[in-house]
Amino acid sequence: MTGIGGFGDRGEERSTLRLPTLSVLYHPDLRRIGARAFLSELAIGREVLVSRNEPELALPDQLVGRPLEDNHVSRKPFRLRSTGDGGIELLLGDSRTGVVADGVSVLQEHRFAPREVERGVVLELAGRVVLLLHVTTPPKETPPRFGLIGDNPALLRVRAEIQRIADLEVPVLLRGETGTGKELAARAIHDAGPRRSAPFLGINLGAIPPSLSSSELFGAVRGAFTGSVTAQEGYFRRAHGGTLFLDEIGETPPEVQVMLLRALETGEIFPVGSQSPLRADVRVVAATDSDLEAKVRDGGFRAPLLHRLSGYEIWMPPLRERRDDIARLLLHFLRQELARIDEGTRLDPAAPSCDPAWLPPRLVARLARYDWPGNVRQLRNVARQLVIGSRGLPRLEIGPQVERLLRIEAPRPVAADLQPAAETPSSPPPALGAIRWRKPSEVGEEELFTALRDHRWDLKATALALGISRTSLYALVDENPRIRKASDLSAEEIESCFQEQGGDLEAMVERLEVSKKALGRRLREMKLA
């Protein structure tokens, strides 16, 4: 169904009207970031005027809004009007407000195609205010936040699902791209449930050598391995009574899958080397960015285990589909990093020394236009780089690494269906099976090195971007003497870098150019972490 202005439901099963919306991405009053105005007039064929004094924009938890009220934005409005097919026209008219749309100055008028509006158009007004023109669904209710930042409908859906299943004992499978916040969602499920006072433990199954997976999960008796002089408790026993978060569940070795299935079905585990079962009362929340159904078809993952893990599934939205949340997330991460270097008052509106100009509006606009293949995790890392690179300076400065990042078009999976994904659980992100795969021989040395660097030496993200399997990527890395592995680094080099970077693992990854997971293992082996 489509409204008069061309803005309607995505699919006949939906009854909620989606409306054109203006959301504040940057305002000199930092408290205004996240405010929005639903432009219902456009949906019924009327024009919307945008000026210093209109429309009124309200924060998600407020009923009454305020206009922009910035003296650099003209009182004379520019106009927005529907093109009738889901597109929107911007007409400057007599407005003296300088408008930049997606990085291009608007001289008189500009038409935004339906696909641009769906993606979100970043509007910079007078170099002072940044707005996002997009289409979204006004919320009918607001679920608890659970520590998750943002009010995009896709995130509201996640929050509602967490509220729905938190007090139940069913296993939960969190699905979605890497870096979308699956561990935060897992912790929210734990904190909102009856096990909140018990342990919450997480283990990344992709970061553990297959030979150690069994003992890490289920423990081991003394003498189970050569050189093992003490018993090992294992994550299931350590999380007894609480919640166990199994990240990258798709990387579980086949022999461990059998043991994991038994633990889920019976609540009993067998430590390695033991013939006697132990009780393990845990709630399991698993996470993956893999296509587990494809792994089942290929024999790499057991169907019964998938069925047992997915008592309830929650899809985590990618950041590019939450463009209206980017500025609030950025502000949150910047404040966190500033606090770490004792400059926390820079962006605190309650502090007399608050300096909103330290954060340039144009930078916020550029970050909002980027597609974030690494999602929220990548945005957090960029915030850290920005703060450290601008430490002690009067204004935030963009270093060469961030500048290079923003000039690169984000690599995205090429899906067969290019229509925007619906904001409902029934329409999950495109399966990884839709990616256009390549032969490893098609990947050149320079392309390989650039992809690794652009994805911060994350092998899974790099393999996905290159369109090859992770096994093929490992082989290419092994064949290329230019690329070092964490195992190639000497203890002296690692210890020296550890001291230089103050133990910051992210900074060490940038400096040493190796996988974060593998470097973390080396640090643990050296008892530095």
List the model feature ranges, each with a label.
Residues 1-12, 16, 36, 102-105, ...:
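Bacterial C-terminal helix-turn-helix
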Residues 1-71:
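Intrinsically disordered, low-complexity acidic Ser/Thr-rich regulatory segments
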Residues 42-120:
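Forkhead-associated
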Residues 136-160, 211:
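Dynamic helix-loop-helix/coil hinge segments at AAA+ ATPase domain boundaries and subdomain interfaces
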Residues 147, 161-226, 237-253, 318-323, ...:
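Conserved post-Walker A coupling segment in P-loop NTPases
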Residues 195-198, 273-283, 291-418, 453-456:
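Nucleotide-binding/hydrolysis machinery
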Residues 222, 256-279, 290-294:
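Conserved catalytic/switch belt of AAA+ P-loop NTPases
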Residues 245-246, 282-288:
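Structural recognition of the conserved hydrophobic beta-strand(s) that form the central parallel beta-sheet
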